[in-house]
From Swiss-Prot:
Binding partners and assembly: Homodimer.
Record: residues binding Zn(2+) 2: 166, 169, 188, 191
SMART domains: DnaJ
Annotated residues for binding of Zn(2+) 1: 149, 152, 202, 205
Family to which this protein belongs: Belongs to the DnaJ family.
Cofactor comment text: Binds 2 Zn(2+) ions per monomer.
ZnF bounds (CR-type): 136-214
Signal peptide positions (record): none
The organism's place on the tree of life at top rank: Bacteria
Source organism: Burkholderia pseudomallei (strain K96243)
Record's protein name: Chaperone protein DnaJ
Gene this chain is encoded by: dnaJ
UniProt keyword annotations, A-Z: Chaperone, Cytoplasm, DNA replication, Metal-binding, Repeat, Stress response, Zinc, Zinc-finger
């Protein structure tokens, strides 16, 4: 009897995604599994047919060959897998049901061996100044870490004893459990995937084989780093379990508020008070920058709130080839605590302005004109 088209068997289109193929197979496998149909030869055949179709279409290379050449394009011996019974059912379902039955994130195992886990990542928060962020900064930090226990030398067992092979999983680290109509492989509940257990734990480390310590690490903060960025130190997180890789350490940077500048990306902003005489007459003023002092000319008649841009006086960011700019926002300062002489001089000055008409205060004239038209 000629084989049916694999896509037809699973009930999916030829352009079906891997996820759609997986879902279709899962549905058919549950429907026709022999545990649900113990006396049905028809169900058994449907199950074998679905299993074979899934094995072909879930493999990228086999699927490509099948799409191009049909059944002749795939290994003719693959069909014999159906005669092997149902021993491979759990393996075929491993990628489908693995997340349902508690596969730990970051975990894995060599086939038949104990569970291996990657160590957890650590996070360290560091505050630096704006100057340190702009110019770069080398420092040292002290972070919690783990070291082999000096009493049991990392074995976790009381001196004079040693770990023994787990009697539940026989050193495999996993046990096979039956759930309903199929079986799954789980981490051994007694040894938690290690393949061994400790009859007499070390009293110093409580059987963990490691003790907490503090280690010092060198941290190089690159010039131009911004608030909230993280620096990764590979392998300096928590140690792995059963030979798994260590996690990473992430140093999160926070920049302290600055007394003069506010940062906006690669640009800097500062508020600069100037005397009203300088604003009226113009003149050169000096401003601070992260690289020292700089000066620029304020034109006569400068109004409060005017912004001046100093190119290249900002910060060169991590991904920038040139530095940002410094924006100076001038605030015209009104004098206070005047002497009698100063008051008299200002009154004379005010009188001379009034005699000159609105040409001395164009913004005031414009504002009063708008107010006048508003009430008309």
């Amino acid at each position: 009897m000629a084989k049916r088209d694999y896509y037809e068997v699973l009930g999916v289109a030829k352009n079906a995604s891997d996820d759609e193929i997986k879902k279709a197979y899962r549905k058919l496998a549950m429907k026709y599994h022999p545990d649900r149909n113990p006396d049905s030869k028809d169900a058994e055949e449907h199950f074998k047919e679905a299993k074979e179709a899934y094995e072909m279409l879930s493999d990228g290379q086999k699927r490509a060959a099948y799409d191009q050449y049909g059944h002749a394009g795939v290994d003719p011996n693959v069909g014999a897998a159906g005669a092997q019974g149902f021993g491979g059912f759990a393996d075929a379902f491993g990628d489908i049901f693995g997340d349902i039955f508690g596969q730990a994130a970051g975990g894995g195992r060599a086939r038949g061996g104990p569970q291996v886990y990657r160590g957890a990542d650590l996070r360290y928060s560091m505050e630096i100044t704006l100057e340190q962020a702009a110019h770069g900064y080398d420092t040292q930090i002290r972070v919690p870490s783990w070291a082999a226990c000096g009493v049991c030398h990392g074995s976790g067992a009381k001196p004079g004893t040693k770990p023994e092979t787990c009697p539940t999983c026989h050193g495999q680290g996993t046990v096979r459990m039956s759930q309903g109509f199929f079986s799954i492989q789980q981490t051994c509940p007694k040894c938690h995937g290690t393949g061994t257990y400790i009859p007499e734990p070390c009293v110093h480390c409580h059987g963990s084989g490691k003790v907490k310590e503090t280690k010092t690490l060198e941290v190089k903060i690159p010039a131009g780093i911004d608030d909230g960025m993280r620096i990764r130190s590979a392998g300096n997180g928590e140690p792995g379990i059963n030979g798994g890789p260590s996690g990473d350490l992430y140093v999160e940077i926070h920049i302290k508020p600055h007394a003069v500048f506010e940062r906006d990306g690669d640009d800097l902003h500062c508020q600069m008070p100037i005397p009203f005489t300088t604003a009226a007459l113009g003149g050169e003023i000096e401003v601070p920058t992260l690289a020292g002092r700089a000066s620029f000319t304020v034109p006569e008649g400068t109004q409060s709130g005017k912004t001046f841009r100093l190119r290249g006086k900002g910060i060169k960011g991590l991904r920038s080839s040139i530095a940002g700019d410094l924006y100076v926002h001038v605030q015209v300062e009104t004098p206070v605590k005047l002497t009698d002489q100063q008051r008299d001089l200002l009154k004379q000055f005010e009188k001379s302005l009034a005699e000159g008409g609105p040409r001395h205060s164009p913004q005031s004239k414009s504002w009063f004109d708008r107010v006048k038209s508003f009430f008309e």
